[in-house]
């Protein structure tokens, strides 16, 4: 099923708490739907984390670009114990190889809750990390390597493909490479219902872009490894249409591959490389 991640690019804690409250107030089945809401936090957001736990948030994404930082695992352990087990799931990342996954597995064993990790660095459709840092790997390569590690080590970690998903075909490929979940921010940015800054012709969206840093107020100035993108309003679709197209594309892709279910298809895609 679909889950939603709430971002942290509002100017104040109060603004972010209002966003969470608005989402919770519009739930038709809170007991079930609250388990599908993730909230993004930074390494300095201890006060904010306590506030969102008080609101009923259970799932935390530690939102840093570099999941290899030693602070990330320590921070995850710290907030879990401070939460008195109110945190039910934690998502780490981002990573581009399997070198850190053993440490993530140790964290799972220590905390005893599901640990997810985002796989993908420099592959996002509004990511400029490659241009700024010179670093990138192919997204399929990253996913496949990490998925192989999870499988061969009988790991309990959950792999989340993050970056480069422009259409349903991209999501299908991510699942085929071994992802169990896929981040879909770029795809759902085309929804009429999504949050954007709107002018007469375009609506803008982006990641850690200069535009977003300016509009988000209070974000420290630094170099940008993201960029904003214009979306012509004539190209926007309803959320229902986007979800229908997504599931239809994935279902057909699974069928073409000779598998009956998405679960069977995950990690069993066959890729032909053209050189």
What is each model feature region?
Residues 1-158, 186-188:
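Active-site entrance/lid segments in N-terminal catalytic domains of soluble metabolic enzymes
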Residues 112-116, 134-161, 165-275:
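Alpha/beta catalytic cores of nucleotide-metabolism and tRNA/nucleoside-modifying enzymes
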């Amino acid at each position: 099923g679909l889950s939603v991640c709430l971002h942290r690019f509002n100017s104040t804690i109060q603004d972010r708490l209002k966003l969470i409250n608005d989402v919770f107030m519009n739930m038709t089945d809170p007991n079930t739907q609250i388990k599908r809401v993730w909230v993004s936090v930074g390494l300095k957001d201890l006060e904010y984390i306590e506030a969102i736990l008080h609101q009923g948030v259970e799932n935390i994404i530690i939102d840093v670009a570099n999941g290899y930082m030693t602070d990330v695992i320590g921070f995850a352990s710290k907030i879990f114990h401070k939460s008195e087990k109110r945190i039910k799931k934690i998502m780490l990342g981002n990573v581009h190889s399997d070198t850190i996954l053993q440490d993530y597995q140790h964290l799972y064993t220590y905390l005893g809750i599901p640990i997810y990790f985002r796989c993908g660095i420099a592959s996002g459709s509004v990511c400029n990390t490659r241009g700024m840092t010179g670093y990138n790997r192919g997204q399929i390569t990253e996913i496949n390597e990490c998925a192989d590690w999870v499988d061969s080590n009988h790991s309990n970690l959950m792999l989340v493909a993050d970056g480069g998903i422009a259409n349903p075909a991209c999501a299908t490929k991510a699942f085929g490479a071994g992802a169990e979940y896929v981040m879909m921010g770029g795809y759902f940015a085309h929804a009429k219902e999504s949050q954007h800054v709107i002018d007469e012709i375009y609506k803008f969206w982006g990641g850690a872009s200069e535009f977003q840093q300016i509009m988000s107020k209070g974000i420290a100035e630094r170099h940008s490894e993201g960029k904003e993108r214009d979306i012509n309003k004539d190209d926007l679709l309803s959320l229902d249409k986007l979800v229908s197209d997504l599931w239809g594309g994935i279902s057909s892709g699974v069928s073409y591959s000779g598998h009956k279910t998405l679960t069977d298809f995950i990690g069993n895609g066959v890729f032909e490389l053209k050189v």
